[in-house]
């Protein structure tokens, strides 16, 4: 996906990028590749691949959810900033918090935010399991997002405690999401969430399947969740 295709395919979905926003994506790409030489941020470094599999793929969430309001967003395990930084570039009014367990990635994101001149972006070096227990962030976000971090039964325990009641947890998944949903239904129920919508589409050019799950927070999450670091992965909430 070249830059012109990136721009026109977003335009088709009602997302018009200014020359400044396109410049920000260019700076993002250059900074990602430069830092990737000294630390492992991504296996994808070829320009057209980055624009398709990282930038465009991140923004697809906005094809199925309206980001036009100044929502507070928490991105769990964003790694090199996906999906929240591409969304922030497209929708500058969003208030973004990224939580990642690796300090080196947080250093990269701080540097990136300065280079992109982003405001209303904050980064936290923490495990999602401990972050989700903290006062002031628990059940504080309009939207919590995660892209390809863990299977749904595990991911729900990391993300739903952070979503305010009435807010949305957006899980961005690859193929075979139906099986994950089946295994994750019980966890959603326990944690106060309910699957509202699942959208399946093909990523252009390479035609690989993507699924976006919109999960509504219906009730408060029981205080015992999230459990201590590592437990959600070892003992997921499954029947």
Swiss-Prot record:
Its main location: cytoplasm. Its EC number is 2.1.1.-. S-adenosyl-L-methionine binds at residues 77, 82, 128-129, 147. InterPro entries: rRNA_ssu_MeTfrase_G, SAM-dependent_MTases_sf. One of its GO terms (cellular component) is cytosol. It holds the Pfam family GidB. It is found in: Cytoplasm. One of its GO terms (molecular function) is rRNA (guanine-N7-)-methyltransferase activity. The keyword Ribonucleoprotein does not apply. Keywords: Cytoplasm, Methyltransferase, rRNA processing, S-adenosyl-L-methionine, Transferase. The keyword S-adenosyl-L-methionine applies. Belongs to the methyltransferase superfamily. RNA methyltransferase RsmG family. NCBIfam families: rsmG_gidB. Specifically methylates the N7 position of guanine in position 535 of 16S rRNA. This is Ribosomal RNA small subunit methyltransferase G. The lineage of its organism: Bacteria, Bacillati, Bacillota, Bacilli, Bacillales.
